[in-house]
From Swiss-Prot:
PROSITE patterns xref list: ZF_C3H1 (PS50103)
InterPro entries with a match to the protein in the record: Unkempt-like (IPR045234), Znf_CCCH (IPR000571)
Zn-finger region bounds: C3H1-type: 75-107, 119-145, 153-177
One Pfam family in the UniProt entry: zf-CCCH_AtC3H23
Entry protein name: Zinc finger CCCH domain-containing protein 20
Residue ranges of the region described as Disordered: 207-226, 334-359
GO molecular function, one term: DNA binding
GO BP terms, alphabetized: defense response to virus; regulation of DNA-templated transcription; response to oxidative stress
Originating species: Arabidopsis thaliana
Length: 359
């Protein structure tokens, strides 16, 4: 028999015995001690808590399950309207996008930030057909999330399921406390007068009302109050400075006008009833009025004298007093007649005090 034929008759099977665990060096550290197996299971259980899973959490309270349960930590209104599917996800590993509240590249649920892009809560008809040419510049909402998570529509209507709602992200309110009441004005028109407080609004209406009476001292009080209110509503520091400067300028003009008219009245009426010195110095030393004054004040010198030139009124000094004394002496004392001895001395006007001017 040939050697090759001897192997053709039978096929021997080799049996390898199992390696004893006591001699295995790779598991000796875990199973060598009596507590090794339990510690390994605890480590795996702790690790399982941080891995994504579709199984419900056995430790969760069934009474807390619902649309606003603590399982979803992102249920506040602000996060849902401005952060949900808007902020980019920072995770590096692959995970379930439907359970992640953040946006991912190429995700259909991605939303535009309503604080940066001005679009309404109305669904875009072109996007429903399949494609919108305007893209992110469109003024309408693209998709269900942009439409119902828009600040103008989110939780403005009650949920038909109420407390029995099991949606992970629900766009509707489940209790009266969750219903959001929208203001009357548009969110884009934050600078309108509708957002002003009732007190400021009434003050603004009173300031522009034609029946409002201005104070007698400030004839432009209504316009000043209107400008001041408008500057506060716009929040402009430059406007406040300009309004304050205009108000101070107006008050200074009013004070100057009142002071000038008061001095003219006192000077005019005092010339006939006051001391003769005041009456003599009236036409020569009267200051230039800042505003036109009414004629007709009593002054005994205005009937016989012409108005002094402007340059003469602004001059001052000893030379002016000498010229004034000479002029007064010629025009008022040349025609004076010596007193009659029979008449009393009280009828003669005393002008001796004029000599004090040249001293």
């Amino acid at each position: 028999m040939m050697i090759g034929e001897s192997h053709r008759g039978f096929n021997p099977t080799v049996h390898i015995p199992p390696w004893p665990l006591s001699e295995d060096l790779t598991v000796s550290d875990i199973y060598g001690s009596p507590d090794g197996g339990s510690s390994m299971m605890e480590a795996l259980a702790e690790l399982q808590r941080y891995l994504p899973s579709n199984e419900p959490d056995p430790d969760s309270d069934p009474d807390l399950s619902g649309p606003d349960s603590p399982i979803d930590a992102y249920t506040c209104d602000h996060f849902r309207m401005y952060e949900f599917k808007v902020r980019r996800c920072a995770r590096g590993r692959s995970h379930d996008w439907t359970e992640c509240p953040y946006a991912h590249p190429g995700e259909k649920a991605r939303r535009r930030d309503p604080r940066k892009f001005h679009y309404s809560g109305t669904a875009c008809p072109e996007f429903r057909k399949g494609c919108c040419k305007r893209g992110d510049a469109c003024e309408f909402s693209h998709g269900v999330f942009e439409c119902w998570l828009h600040p103008a529509r989110y939780r403005t209507q009650p949920c038909k399921d109420g407390g029995n709602c099991r949606r992970r992200v629900c766009f509707f309110a489940h209790s009266p406390d969750q219903i959001r009441v929208l203001p009357n004005q548009s969110p884009d028109r934050v600078d309108s007068f509708d957002v002003l407080s009732p007190t400021i609004r009434r003050a603004f209406q009173f300031s522009i009302s034609p029946s409002s009476n201005s104070p007698p001292v400030s004839p432009r009080g209504d316009s000043d109050s209107s400008c001041s209110l408008l500057s506060r509503s716009l929040g402009s520091n430059l406007g406040n400075d300009v309004v304050a400067s205009l108000r101070n300028l107006q008050l200074n003009k009013v004070k100057s006008s009142l002071s000038s008219s008061y001095n003219n009245q006192i000077g005019g009426y005092g010339s006939g009833f006051g001391s003769p010195r005041g009456s003599v110095l009236g036409p020569g030393f009267r200051s230039l009025p800042t505003t036109p004054t009414r004629p007709g004040f009593m002054n005994i010198w205005e009937n016989g004298l012409e108005e002094e030139p402007a340059m003469e009124r602004v001059e001052s000094g000893r030379e002016l007093r000498a010229q004034l004394f000479e002029k007064l002496s010629k025009e008022n004392c040349m025609g004076r007649i010596e007193p009659d001895p029979d008449q009393g001395a009280g009828d003669t006007p005393d002008v001796g005090w004029v000599s004090d001017l040249v001293m």
